Amino acid sequence: QACLDHVFQRRIASCLVNPRAGHETELRYEPAQTRKRFAVVGAGPAGLACATVLAERGHQVDLLDSAATIGGQFNLAMRVPGKEEFAETLRYFRRRLQVTGVNVRLGARADVPVLRAGRYDEVVLATGVTARDPEIPGADAQRDSGRVLGYADVLLGRYECGPRVAVVG
């Protein structure tokens, strides 16, 4: 992670969780002059940070995600050996959501009727990323057999890897 990697490289520390880290005197969160209703769509790292900062500034915030839990890709990342500390990051955000008063709506699809019904002043889309397909010729024919896998297939235990593995991408 950038927090330690940058320090060891004698660069300014940065943080995946706290965008102000290393810039506390420059990046100040001022109270909002006009309180607004925000919908933040996506409860991954970006959505969590956005929702809590907006609420901290005095806005009314609904955080919507179709998943049953917060975290987005962090829920996969913390399954990687040596990356278990991401679970602590999610614990931190759960607490921040409580303290800042963000209204968390899990299992909620944020389609147009839902967003219109919410009468939001602003909508922030923080829906995250999907894995890039390296478009290897012939790979599509091998996916169903488990011979070509995405990282989520392995981390979620859908398939086991054999003794010989090539990582591409």
Segments and roles (model prediction):
Residues 1-35:
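Cysteine-cluster motifs in flexible loop/terminal segments that predominantly coordinate metals
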Residues 18-31, 95-96, 104-106, 127, ...:
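Glycine-rich dinucleotide-binding loop and its adjacent helix/turn
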Residues 34-46, 163-169:
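Beta1/beta-strand and adjacent pyrophosphate-binding region of the FAD-binding site
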Residues 40-103:
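Beta1-alpha1 glycine-rich phosphate/pyrophosphate-binding loop at the start
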Residues 51, 84-91, 105-110, 116-122, ...:
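Catalytic cores of nucleotide-enabled group-transfer and carboxylate-activating enzymes in metabolic
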Residues 64, 120-128, 168:
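Short hydrophobic core segments
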Residues 79-83, 123, 142:
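Short, hinge-like loop/turn segments at secondary-structure boundaries
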